[in-house]
Amino acid sequence: MAVISISRQFGAGGKTLGEAVALDLGYRFVHEGMLDKLACELADSHPQSAGCEFYAQAHLTNVLSSLGPADYLDYYIKQDDRLLSQEQHLGALNRVIKELAEMDNTVLLGRGSQFILRDHPGVLRILLVADQKSRVDFLIRRYGFSTGKAQGLLKRADKKRSRFLKLFFPREPNETSLYHMVLNTTWLSLDLAKGLILDLVKRMGV
């Protein structure tokens, strides 16, 4: 039983890899768009409640089941940038991520989970990187974007990731000492990367 936190450069294959790892392990997979929607609902439902530290697990599960695959790209294409400066949202996001970690058997993608869960036992922190050409090629191949659209989306995603993490977390997200494993998908196939993560889960016995 484990929680896997995947941080990645957009286009390095994090969502595809995270889904595959979760499927093989029988874990739930929760990406940025889902985490933001859970946090927004928590903030809306309990905006001033100091006594509500965590969502009930059943409620989290119900909300997760209502979120579809479109929520992932919506995070990069349609999200209101003002969300990134709201400390209330970060507080709710922090609580949601910690509650999901308590539920165990979860793969989390992004939103600072590598920082939020740094001292949480049983959490494996993975970083995916790739060069820009490989990331653009992946977006074209995986989502059918034109080269221009893929390049524009990559630039926007990198800017959002950098701004969010610099606002709320004190360390560089690509600092390798934060992670149990760093995988470069320029050189590694996603299938090989998945195998390495599964082997790490098994060897660490978490």
What is the predicted function of each stretch?
Residues 1-4, 8, 104:
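Pre-Walker A (Motif I) flank of P-loop NTPase domains
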Residues 5-19:
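Glycine-rich phosphate-binding P-loop
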Residues 28-40:
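Short beta-strand-centered segment that lines the nucleotide-binding/catalytic pocket of NTP-utilizing
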Residues 57-67, 72, 146-190:
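Small-molecule kinase domains that catalyze NTP-dependent phosphoryl transfer to phosphate-bearing small molecules
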Residues 39-105:
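ATP-dependent small-molecule kinase phosphotransfer cores
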Residues 119-142, 147-157:
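Conserved phosphate-donor/acceptor-positioning beta-strand/loop module used by diverse small-molecule
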Residues 100, 112-119, 138:
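RNA pseudouridine synthases
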Residues 111, 127-132, 145-146, 156, ...:
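Long, contiguous binding/interaction regions
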